[in-house]
Amino acid sequence: MEKRELVMACMNHLPIDRVPVGFWFHFPEGKKLGQPCVQAHLDYYNNVDVDMAKIMCDGYFDYPNPLAQSVQKASDWYALKPLGKDHPFIREQVDRVKAVRDGLRDPGLPVFYNVFAPFSSIRYGTSDELVMAHLKEDPKAVAHALDVIAEDNSILCEMLMTEAGCDGVYYCVQGGEKNRMSVEMYRKYITPSDKAVLSHANKFSPYNILHCCGWAGDPNNLEDWQDYPAKVINWAAFIEKMDMVKGRAFFGGKTVLGGCDNRKTGVLYSGTKAEVQKFIRGLIASFDSDTGYMIGADCTLPGDIDLQRIDWVLEAVHNA
């Protein structure tokens, strides 16, 4: 099967001839913006035979709304207005994706772009400490700000698919750590903006991936995101202690992506070729279905990983 046919069939629980594979990582300083960033993506995806491309939003983590830089008390958030579709923050990300898409040797390679949920955008644009303090001071004010940011993140998703040729977004939700807030608080104040963006993205593509991020190493309340309307779910299996089969059941039988520890202590980064391939064969053998499973990592791989290691995974998958 061609890569596009393979990935889309797997997402739709249709028969496939092998398990799809996708890995990605952040790029170093000097390759986070502009043409160097585009070229870094092309150097990877045109030379490593993975089945899908996830384009990074490196350089665009911070939400550059002027008001966000001057907020002092929680009630200040009520004055927040969207950046709008013509703001460079949005326009430049769309242009990045189009440039990568146009430069791929395989024009059929499925392409996804990393979009953060509003609760991540607001914290990157200010600080985690400030937002959490304001959430305690006036949670409705923060929820209002998240709704405004959701307008920008939603139009970004729309333009990525209508103008840049994205097949879907890789939608990253964060902030659900068990030690941060309760499920009830998250669902009341954070979930509405999370879902607003994802639901808008779903209007333009049915192939959106939900990434339940565990980058900090702290377990999340996965219940926060259990009912989110995404086609594919990815979570930090090694942080959450929830393997692929259990996770697929937890998320209602949706297609799942992952299975590999992204950390430097994991076998993918530190194991021998024999160890890596043994792990991958065991992972595939553990799946309880011939479709609906995609091999990837808990999160981004370390930027200094030897790309030959991804080739080892691909070799094991193709020979399985």
PLM regions and their residue ranges:
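Alpha/beta catalytic barrel-like cores
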Residues: 24-27, 49-83
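CN hydrolase (nitrilase-like) catalytic-core segments centered on the catalytic cysteine
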Residues: 45
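Active-site loop segments of alpha/beta catalytic cores
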Residues: 1-35, 40, 51, 55, ...
